[in-house]
Amino acid sequence: MAERGGESGAERGGDRGDFGRGFGGGRGGGRGRDRGPRGRGRRGGRASEETKWVPVTKLGRLVADNKITKLEQIYLHSLPVKEYQIIDHLVGPTLKDEVMKIMPVQKQTRAGQRTRFKAFVVVGDGNGHVGLGVKCSKEVATAIRGAIILAKLSVVPVRRGYWGNKIGKPHTVPCKVTGKCGSVTVRMVPAPRGSGIVAARVPKKVLQFAGIDDVFTSSRGSTKTLGNFVKATFDCLQKTYGFLTPEFWKETRFSRSPYQEHTDFLSTKAVSATKVITEGEDQA
């Protein structure tokens, strides 16, 4: 019986045994075979294509043209970073990110409770740069993606120092520093080389991303609130550049801003862009 059923299926043109070709197996069963990918496959292929970064800010144009090659040049003149691709271009290969927590949050409306997801993401290169991003969205993936972008936009420099003699590379915080968010207070104390990061799980991860090897920490308040705990740690690291030490007492020699140095480049680009727009309008 099985052989007869298989023969009947083969006679009908089917290659699946007794089931034939399914719907439309006899007439037009091969329609559209040579038309290439259709439906979701084609749409997914378009989404996977990498789009080239086209900078829209002055700083982005300078970075894309390799006029600025280090983040320190941006921090020195306090230039605002409005495009996350700038961070990717300068420290992209060494930058790591980690999702610290995803928590549901609710808002009461007339129609009922509206639930969204809040993501906390930390990024850092382990060499004196760290950022924190918080994003709320209807979907988890969208919240994580947005938090990563915000974390890159908020990357700040972390100042490192020594506990005793200045031997080797800086390994700890330069002095005692305190950060606060809500009821949570985090205090960091310099530690001798080899002590490691003496901290809870949440601040330890942030300190590792910042590139600090040895530090003593203490915290107080509602540290169970992870969001405030992370923000207090990030605030602590931000304040490492907020004080003057004897090495900064000498007279400061100011240098020109990148915008002033590359004025001709920026004006040329702007003029060429306006010419293209006007020519297109004239042709239309």
Curated annotation (Swiss-Prot):
Signal peptide (residue range): none
Basic and acidic residues bias (residue ranges): 1-19
A Pfam family annotated for this UniProt entry: Ribosomal_S5
UniProt keywords, alphabetically: Ribonucleoprotein, Ribosomal protein
GO cellular component, one term: nucleus
Domain of life of the organism encoding this protein: Eukaryota
Record-linked SUPFAM superfamilies: dsRNA-binding domain-like, Ribosomal protein S5 domain 2-like
Gene Ontology molecular function: mRNA binding; structural constituent of ribosome
InterPro entries, per the entry: Ribosomal_Su5_D2-typ_SF, Ribosomal_uS5, Ribosomal_uS5_C, Ribosomal_uS5_euk/arc, Ribosomal_uS5_N, Ribosomal_uS5_N_CS, Ribsml_uS5_D2-typ_fold_subgr
Residue spans of biased composition, Gly residues class: 20-29
GO BP field: translation
Keyword Ribonucleoprotein recorded: yes
Region (Disordered): 1-51
Ranges of residues in domain S5 DRBM: 95-158
Family affiliation: Belongs to the universal ribosomal protein uS5 family.
Record-given protein name: Small ribosomal subunit protein uS5y/uS5u/uS5v
Gene expressing this chain: RPS2B
